Amino acid sequence: MYLPQEIIRKKRDGEVLTADEINFFIQGVANNTVSEGQIAAFAMTIFFNEMTMDERIALTCAMRDSGMVIDWSHMNFGGPIVDKHSTGGVGDVTSLMLGPMVAACGGFVPMISGRGLGHTGGTLDKLEAIPGYNITPTNEVFGQVTKDAGVAIIGQTGDLAPADKRVYATRDITATVDNISLITASILSKKLAAGLESLVMDVKVGSGAFMPTYEASEELAKSIVAVANGAGTKTTAILTDMNQVLASSAGNAVEVREAVRFLTGEYRNPRLLEVTMASCAEMLVLAKLAENTDDARAKLMEVLDNGKAAACFGKMVAGLGGPADFVENYDNYLEKAEIIKPVYATETGIVSAMDTRAIGMAVVSMGGGRRVATDEIDYAVGFDNFIRLGEVADSDKPLAVIHARSEGQWEEAAKALRSAIKVGGEYTPTPEVYRQIRAEDI
């Protein structure tokens, strides 16, 4: 028998907690015998004294086990269960292509996604731009759609990692969000509760990333790989660039439109293709669906080009309540804004930098994201046809096309975009993918 305050005292004094102590504390969080004040104090001691890898593994497992851990064995999927998680960015629509691509190669992807957070877009908000798409199906429907389509993307249920929900809510109001140990446990407890056999983590770097520096992003990636593998789930991380909008679009309906066009081959943004392929290839290799990344990439291009990936996406949408002909007739279903017109730079020159975070916040300001949890999303607004770093902005090449509800909203968005995109000055290219971090690298 332990006392929460003694566990807090021990960590406050810089000592290492045992797995039993961490389990006891997190069970108390889940059953409400640990108070909000004690959660806040516990988080702050970790913030200042950090945790060893063994402590992080124990914390992640305790939070994972605080609620339901999905067991897919009764579904007899007949293939490996794989997933990916991204730390989030702007125009990061990879999940919508990646899930169907991996499914078409023989993987099963039961993906539990989130809503938009701050400047980053949420996969669930994008999918809800599709009429009828149900992000909260029963576990039976979740499993059946995953089996039939190879992929199902839904929202988190209250049964998964409930301790994380309490801890996160307290961290959010006590300045303890940005800590590697706590971020690692929060991300992984939810993902590992989904019954995965392997996971690929996409950690963003740059002006639109969650972590402030390359070094911090790399440290988080290493922590996630070490802890997830320590908890028994094969995991790899990739560090990818978020110094500019990833896709050609940012918003909800505009990104879904781009995802479908990507899957059907109508248009594939080269940066988006590279980052999506990098994540998918790691997933196939980890799941033993490909021998190496070259083999994986060949298989992935094949399912893109022969229509199998697009078919998996269509099957998922229909299985979760969306239109059966969505892939064929997406433009009939996705909401459109009243005003769709380009915005040009005030001067001619090379685009040398983007404040990607500011672009994400511009989408939020238009109503394409939430300031508070109760805000309604406007699915139609956003940007598309983004200029890329290194390209020349002039009277022929706009910065982007704005999808707005009114002239006034268009003007506001144009002003935000012009101040977020730097024209002129030195441009230093950055790679789409900086590096992979595998278990053997740690």
UniProtKB/Swiss-Prot annotation:
Pathway named in the protein's UniProt entry: Pyrimidine metabolism; dTMP biosynthesis via salvage pathway; dTMP from thymine: step 1/2
GO CC aspect terms: cytosol
Keyword ATP-binding attached: no
Transmembrane segments: none
EC code(s) of this entry: 2.4.2.4
Function noted in UniProt: The enzymes which catalyze the reversible phosphorolysis of pyrimidine nucleosides are involved in the degradation of these compounds and in their utilization as carbon and energy sources, or in the rescue of pyrimidine bases for nucleotide synthesis.
Name recorded for this polypeptide: Thymidine phosphorylase
Taxonomic lineage from the root: Bacteria, Pseudomonadati, Pseudomonadota, Gammaproteobacteria, Vibrionales
